[in-house]
């Protein structure tokens, strides 16, 4: 434990802000249980701090990536050599960092004394993809619209370096890398800008408007990739695929690309749908999706068959999906009828498989929704993939915020509308086998999440000073902790989750919100 003692001493010598910023833990880090078992003298905050960067670096995609070794080595120059020689992993890929850029930037915002700018610049020089993704996130961090009421005063010095870092990255590109960067960004800026161009158009003209704009965009080489899936090379835009999605203030659009795998057969072309939206601060979605990713890893670690899909956010990518609202535009029935149309008669293998997929995904998002409290859960924000699984998107209202000036009209902890209960509970009175399976999975998922309460809270707490709307009112961290009910026994917590499921069952406020969205926005209910 000598190396652990040394690191904890290092952490203890840093300002309090260091520990306040860092308390979030690696959900997959194999050392975490060992550290807790063998180091009773160290607080949870110390252990969280020890594993903070490990969390970012632990999403191993390709441990043979030589560039990764340089990235880690460069980062290790910012901490005492006696520590990094013994503790840190040395073979982690750049891609393993990129899934957590937003929190990574939050982490480094309090470490200016550790040559943050130099580290980011050196890392960007090792990989074009790393540089591109970093630039996208730096742009998201420095948008003037999101600076309100001095929200960034505490991070003013960090904000000051953002534009400089971006420019220095671009200045450091070779001519070939600069050409690649310019083509990639120009292409997707044109695609994304369509969302803004549609805003003044009447709804009935938006489909034609998307096609008209897409026809103007020309491919600029065969090396362009989807920003959230760098292994997917874009071959062509399906100009007829554009669909305007439902949103009160924006016009998100879904566009399908024909793509090939970077390392696969380039003749094997497949469709990949992406959602683009102009004018939104996506960092709140990133925060919600990090918690969802953490929950997914927790469920997997304890052997729970619960489904969550923490999609990527730059533009948002959710493959092979349609929103519930879109499904309603092509059929008069509810989910029960739609599932029969798509998967066969009730009782058939295909239907029951789809129902099971819907069940495990609904249970996963029930637990996530209880903790994150996402609102604005109209049918435009619920996607279904081609095997029946539910995916929640658009986390513009989480924790303490809700639409309509924080009316909190949607007061169920998660959405469980009448048509959803028809699939989950054929009996209609909470007596069916599938209903009991659903509730059982919700309980097991909630109990599993409670065991990692500090880690989940730390993930959210790290962004507390970010200026995000979800932290703008009330006591978001305190109320998040209350929803875990740490004072309860496991039995009491299980009963609490059962009551949450019962309360959400076809709740009138859920139906009422869907009706309001249908009347105001035309969102199919």
Swiss-Prot record:
Q: Which CDD domains match?
A: PI4Kc_III_alpha
Q: Which InterPro entries match?
A: Kinase-like_dom_sf, PI3/4_kinase_cat_dom, PI3/4_kinase_cat_sf, PI3/4_kinase_CS, PI_Kinase
Give the span(s) annotated as Activation loop. 392-417
What are its GO biological-process terms?
phosphatidylinositol phosphate biosynthetic process
The GO molecular function terms of this record are:
1-phosphatidylinositol 4-kinase activity
Tell me the segments the record calls region Catalytic loop. 373-381
**Spans annotated as Pleckstrin homology (PH) domain conferring phosphoinositide binding specificity:** 163-278
| Role played | Acts on phosphatidylinositol (PtdIns) in the first committed step in the production of the second messenger inositol-1,4,5,-trisphosphate.
UniProt similarity note: Belongs to the PI3/PI4-kinase family. Type III PI4K subfamily.
Q: What is this protein called?
A: Phosphatidylinositol 4-kinase alpha 2
The record lists the lineage as: Eukaryota, Viridiplantae, Streptophyta, Embryophyta, Tracheophyta
Q: Which gene encodes it?
A: PI4KA2
């Amino acid at each position: 434990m000598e190396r652990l003692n040394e690191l904890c001493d290092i952490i203890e010598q840093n300002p309090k802000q260091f520990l306040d910023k860092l308390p979030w833990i690696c959900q997959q880090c194999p050392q975490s249980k060992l550290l807790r078992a063998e180091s009773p003298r160290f607080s949870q905050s110390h252990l969280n701090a020890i594993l903070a960067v490990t969390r970012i670096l632990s999403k191993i995609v390709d441990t043979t990536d030589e560039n990764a070794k340089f990235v880690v080595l460069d980062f290790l120059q910012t901490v005492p050599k006696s520590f990094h020689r013994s503790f840190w992993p040395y073979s982690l890929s750049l891609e393993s960092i990129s899934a957590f850029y937003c929190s990574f930037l939050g982490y480094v915002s309090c470490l200016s004394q550790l040559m943050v700018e130099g580290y980011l610049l050196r890392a960007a020089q090792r990989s074009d993809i790393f540089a591109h993704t970093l630039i996208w996130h730096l742009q998201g961090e420095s948008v003037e619209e999101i600076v309100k009421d001095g929200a960034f005063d505490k991070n003013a010095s960090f904000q000051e370096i953002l534009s400089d870092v971006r420019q220095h990255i671009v200045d450091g590109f070779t001519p070939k890398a600069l050409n690649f960067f310019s083509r990639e960004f120009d292409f997707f800026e044109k695609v994304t800008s369509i969302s803004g161009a549609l805003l003044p158009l009447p709804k009935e003209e938006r489909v034609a408007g998307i096609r008209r704009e897409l026809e103007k965009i020309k491919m600029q080489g065969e090396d362009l990739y989807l920003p959230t899936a760098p292994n997917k090379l874009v071959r062509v835009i399906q100009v007829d695929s554009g669909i305007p999605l439902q949103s009160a203030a924006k016009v998100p659009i879904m566009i399908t690309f024909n793509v090939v795998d970077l390392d696969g057969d380039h003749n094997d072309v497949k469709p990949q749908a992406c959602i683009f939206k102009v004018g939104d601060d996506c960092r709140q979605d990133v925060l919600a999706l990090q918690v969802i990713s953490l929950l997914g890893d927790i469920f997997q670690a304890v052997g729970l068959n619960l489904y969550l899909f923490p999609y990527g956010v730059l533009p948002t990518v959710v493959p092979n999906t349609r929103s519930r609202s879109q499904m309603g535009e092509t059929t008069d029935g509810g989910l029960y009828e739609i599932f029969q149309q798509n998967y066969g008669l009730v009782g058939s293998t295909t239907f029951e498989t789809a129902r099971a997929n819907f069940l495990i995904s609904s249970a996963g998002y029930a637990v996530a929704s209880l903790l994150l409290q996402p609102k604005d859960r109209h049918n435009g924000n619920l996607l279904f993939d081609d095997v029946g699984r539910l995916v929640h998107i658009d986390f513009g209202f989480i924790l303490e915020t809700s639409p309509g000036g924080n009316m909190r009209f949607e007061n169920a902890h998660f959405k469980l509308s009448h048509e959803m209960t028809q699939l989950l509970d054929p009996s209609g009175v909470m007596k069916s086998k599938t209903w009991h399976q659903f509730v059982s999975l919700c309980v097991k998922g909630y109990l599993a999440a409670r065991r990692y309460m500090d880690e989940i809270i730390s993930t959210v707490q790290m962004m507390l000073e970010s200026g995000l709307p979800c932290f703008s009112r009330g006591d978001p961290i305190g109320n998040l902790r209350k929803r875990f009910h740490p004072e309860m026994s496991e039995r009491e917590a299980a009963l609490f989750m059962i009551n949450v499921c019962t309360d959400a069952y076809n709740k009138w406020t859920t139906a009422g919100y869907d009706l309001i969205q249908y009347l105001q926005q035309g969102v199919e209910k």
